[in-house]
Amino acid sequence: PLYSSAASDVYKRQVGRNGSGKTMLFRALSGLMKVDSGAVTLDGRRLHKDFEMLPGLGIMLENAGLYPDLSAVDNLSFLMGINKKPDIRIIKEYISRVGLDPDDKRPFRKYSLGMKHRLVFAQAIMDNPSILLLDEPTNSLDEGGVSLIRELVLNMKDENRIIIITSHNREDIDMLADVVYSMSDGRLTKV
């Protein structure tokens, strides 16, 4: 098993070269991808069936689930509306938290890469998930964006969550990780 059990006060971190399987692992953990064998379990309980999103899960994959022709508010409203009635006040709060203007009406496709990355992060955290999977959370960000995302992640670390992060950024690893795993050819090794 990847983790025989997970304590919410433990911060896991994976590192590895491009193509080593980190993003694929996140897709399997989240239920977005069918796995050939095995199951995702937490404390001995199977968390989901294939292609069924884990309840209480926030996941950040590059541009995942966001629509190019919708504004930030419309994108997050649509995603929040899948499970419950969207609360525009909360949506705007999360857009502001990641340093974006909630009143910006531009479509997502017109955002810079860093702005897109911030919105994907907001999408991952807006339902206050108990388990958070973050794939390269500071990638494509300027210095201010990196500091902001690191601060948000550190704050969430103190809120009784399970957080698993992939990164190539050594500074992120040193600052954010309690436990580090390296991934090579689809295999995890504790560092």
Model feature map: region roles:
Residues 132-136:
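Catalytic Walker B motif of ABC-type/P-loop ATPase nucleotide-binding domains
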Residues 77, 88-103:
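Conserved ABC ATPase "signature" region
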Residues 1-11:
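Single conserved hydrophobic/aromatic residue that forms the stacking wall/gate
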Residues 30:
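Helix-to-loop junction immediately C-terminal to a conserved catalytic motif
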Residues 38-53:
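Conserved ABC transporter NBD signature motif
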